[in-house]
Amino acid sequence: MTRAFYIGRFQPYHFGHHTIIKQIAEEVDELVVGIGSAQKSHESTDPFTAGERVLMVYNALENLPIRHYVLPIEDIKYNSIWVHHVASRTPHFEVVYSNNPLVIQLFREAGVCVKQSPLYIRERYSGTEIRRRMIAGEKWEHLVPKSVVEVIKEIDGVTRLRNVSASDNNSSL
């Protein structure tokens, strides 16, 4: 049995992530999805809480044909021990899927097999672009699974994003 790890901020979870996860699911038996930067929320680049993102991902993966876990992973100050931090918060996994150069470097240094995940129309399916559309009042719903739209509407996430993006003096209290 092979269990994989895939991490993202998922601000918000979109069809780019969804396509990658479906491809990973064809190669492994189980998948651990890490909600990265779990401590961040209510910021223009990170508007959603870890709990909201867990719900987005969990609901979107409801029909994934393999067992999967969705777990929050907080950032830490020391990159050199980050892999151990992740390992202490997740079930054991044999392979990591990532395109993030730092994530790749840290897991390779720790002796973990790393596979690069294919990017899926990144210029269209990116959290940055989706958040930009939300702020601008443009259509964004077609870029994310329906279940993600439902979570964002339930929490009035677009209004939150617009409010926290209105000032550059809101990064911390």
Swiss-Prot record:
Its main location: cytoplasm. It is an enzyme of class 2 (transferase). Keywords: ATP-binding, Cytoplasm, NAD, Nucleotide-binding, Nucleotidyltransferase, Pyridine nucleotide biosynthesis, Transferase. GO terms for molecular function: ATP binding; nicotinamide-nucleotide adenylyltransferase activity. It is found in: Cytoplasm. SUPFAM superfamilies: Nucleotidylyl transferase. Pathway: Cofactor biosynthesis; NAD(+) biosynthesis; NAD(+) from nicotinamide D-ribonucleotide: step 1/1. Its EC number is 2.7.7.1. It holds the Pfam family CTP_transf_like. GO terms for biological process: NAD biosynthetic process. The keyword Ubl conjugation does not apply. InterPro entries: Cyt_trans-like, NMN_Atrans_arc, Rossmann-like_a/b/a_fold. Gene3D superfamilies: HUPs. The keyword Protein biosynthesis does not apply. PANTHER family: BIFUNCTIONAL NMN ADENYLYLTRANSFERASE_NUDIX HYDROLASE, PHOSPHOPANTETHEINE ADENYLYLTRANSFERASE. Belongs to the archaeal NMN adenylyltransferase family. This is Nicotinamide-nucleotide adenylyltransferase. It comes from Methanosarcina barkeri (strain Fusaro / DSM 804).
